[in-house]
From Swiss-Prot:
Descriptive protein name: 2,3-dihydroxyphenylpropionate/2,3-dihydroxicinnamic acid 1,2-dioxygenase
Enzyme class: oxidoreductase
Pathway: Aromatic compound metabolism; 3-phenylpropanoate degradation
Organism listed in the record: Klebsiella pneumoniae subsp. pneumoniae (strain ATCC 700721 / MGH 78578)
Gene3D superfamilies: LigB-like
Name of the encoding gene: mhpB
């Protein structure tokens, strides 16, 4: 059956700290073009690989991968809030299939997700509730992290399952590219932050959430003035990564360790593993071709911002 893929960077800073209007218009055109192609594809099912930013997953239990059999977006940074339309029976069947493939996938019947999941559904489909979705969390910030190889194998297992469904499937990857915003780390946390990282942050009081969001906004403003205030963006790495995906050379990423990736491109760059999972899933459908590649480093959003599509060849 036919499948379509789109991978897109996300940023909570849209509307809070934006680049100049010409750049913003350029990004909006890229997203609008991707949205048009997706609408023409008319998906019957979406599989969304995305990370979390200590809004739904914490160190009380931190799985490398988790499939939401029920999921709700919290609406952080003015992103869309509400329930995701997860087809529960299909999600359960998917979980069984992936576990039977030898991949240790966790499940959640009450998964809480943030802008990392909400933004691609908003930007590319027009809302959270437009198409049934299987939301798959990939841990991209909370060490210890899954590596490229294990993430690729997860994607391949997902693709084999999807290819049995006889549906038009849209495969989305959300995150990256190179970036290192001010994400907390357990090893450096004081007592209050440690409590939040161990699960106390799941239901933050509104004033504390606002202070947390303002810290990110302030960091972005500083980064536009002083590129040394955060880990620099790495356009060379970002473009190399996108080229490897376009050429189907996913396994070449297996040799890159997590510490090496953090040093090259920033500690939140591990979100790009959502792109790897998406392309690995697409590979189960047979021949495909890429299209719509876009890349620009955008310091206002603390991100190497990328967009890339691919479609199976019938």
């Amino acid at each position: 059956m036919h499948a379509y893929l789109h991978c897109l960077s996300h940023t909570p800073l849209v509307g809070f700290v934006d680049p100049e209007q010409a750049v913003l218009d350029e990004v909006n055109r890229v997203i609008a073009d991707a949205r048009r192609r997706i609408a023409e594809f008319d998906p019957e099912l979406v599989v969304l690989f995305a990370p979390d930013h200590y809004n739904g997953f914490f160190y009380d239990v931190m799985p490398p991968f988790c499939l939401g059999i029920g999921a709700t977006a919290i609406g952080d940074f003015a992103s869309a809030a509400g329930d995701l339309p997860v087809p529960a029976e299909l999600a359960e069947a998917c979980a069984h299939a992936i576990l039977n493939s030898g991949i240790d996938l966790a499940v959640s019947y009450n998964m809480q997700v943030d802008h990392g999941f909400a933004q691609p559904l908003e930007f590319l489909l027009g809302g959270l509730d437009r198409v049934p979705v299987l939301p798959v969390f990939i841990n991209g910030v909370a060490a210890p992290l899954p590596g490229f190889q294990r993430t690729r194998l997860l994607g391949e297992a997902m693709g084999r399952f999807l290819n049995t469904l006889n549906k038009r499937v849209l495969i989305l990857g959300s995150g990256g590219l190179s970036h290192q915003p001010p994400v907390p780390e357990l090893a450096k946390a004081d007592a209050h932050l440690r409590d939040r990282l161990l699960g106390g942050g799941k239901q933050l009081p509104p004033d504390e959430r606002e202070r947390r969001q303002q810290r990110v906004i302030s960091a972005a403003r500083r980064f536009t003035e002083d590129p040394h205030s955060l880990h620099p963006l790495n356009p060379v790495w970002d473009n190399r990564f996108m080229s490897l995906l376009e050429q189907g050379r996913l396994s070449e990423l297996d040799a890159i360790g997590n510490d090496e990736l953090s040093a090259m491109a920033g500690k939140s760059t591990h979100e790009i593993k959502t792109w790897v999972a998406a392309f690995a899933a697409l590979s189960a459908f047979g021949r495909w071709r890429s299209e719509g590649r876009y890349y620009r480093p955008i310091p206002e959003w603390i991100a190497g911002f990328g967009s890339l599509s691919a479609t199976t060849e019938i």
